[in-house]
From Swiss-Prot:
Pfam families: DUF480. Belongs to the UPF0502 family. This is UPF0502 protein PA14_19450. It comes from Pseudomonas aeruginosa (strain UCBPP-PA14). PANTHER family: UPF0502 PROTEIN YCEH.
Length: 221
């Protein structure tokens, strides 16, 4: 791991649940803007998606709700009051003074852990239109300069360097690096293309929206 400035989150790190929530909000803002901001139920489903998530989680509404309140207190999410349901949106750009490309990259690192430049370029195609890996490297280095990300040197058996976010606890970060080292060239579980993963994720989100709509209709019957 290269030497970088200390993370501003070192004394009050994000939990794994916090990171999953923020990453899910960043993703859905870009991929399904018609359903964003997200209701609590939609956010739980987004956090627990089987695609584009590493690791896959099984969070409860209680866990997500508790983390949302903590994130709200830190200025990283905002509650949007609605006539039918309250919704949540991230405020990473304002809260951390980030530009859109950096928000997109942090979102991916929150959702999938350490990744190579080429992986980030492929997986970011629906979040932000990066020109090439060098543009991604530029923004990652800006994040690293503020202690929000770190460059990981290639390890034995790896073909490419990786980057990871630094907003989590030391234990979580060490576990992510250890998992990467135990399977250095791991791929997506089903070896899905980025487009296929995106389509599945969008279908899951739309299904969640339909389920919410049905629940509201049944509740009003």
């Amino acid at each position: 791991m290269s030497t970088e400035p200390n993370s501003p989150f070192v004394d009050d790190p994000l939990s794994a649940v916090d990171a999953r929530i923020l990453g899910s909000l960043v993703e859905k803002q870009a991929t399904t803007p018609e359903t964003y901001p997200l209701t609590l139920n939609a956010l739980v489903l987004a956090c627990n998606q089987k695609t584009s998530r590493d690791p896959v989680m099984n969070l409860t509404p209680g866990q997500v709700g508790q983390s949302l309140r903590q994130l709200e207190g830190r200025g990283l999410v905002r509650l949007v009051m609605g006539s039918r349901a309250d919704r949540w949106e991230h405020t990473l750009g304002k809260g951390l003074e980030l530009v859109a490309p950096q928000v997109a990259l942090l979102g991916l690192l929150f959702l999938r852990g350490p990744q190579t430049l080429s992986e980030l370029l492929t997986r970011s195609n629906r979040l932000h239109d990066f020109d090439d890996v060098e543009q991604i490297r530029h923004h990652l280095e800006r994040l690293a300069g503020r202690g929000l990300a770190v460059h990981l040197e290639r390890r034995a058996g790896q073909r490419e360097e990786r980057y990871m976010h630094l907003l989590g606890s030391q234990a979580d970060l060490e576990a992510a690096v250890e998992a990467m080292g135990s399977d250095p060239e791991r791929a997506a579980p089903a070896a899905l293309s980025a487009d296929a993963e995106a389509r599945i994720a969008e279908l899951e989100t739309r299904l969640a929206a339909l389920e919410e709509r049905l629940a509201r209709l049944e509740g009003g019957a």
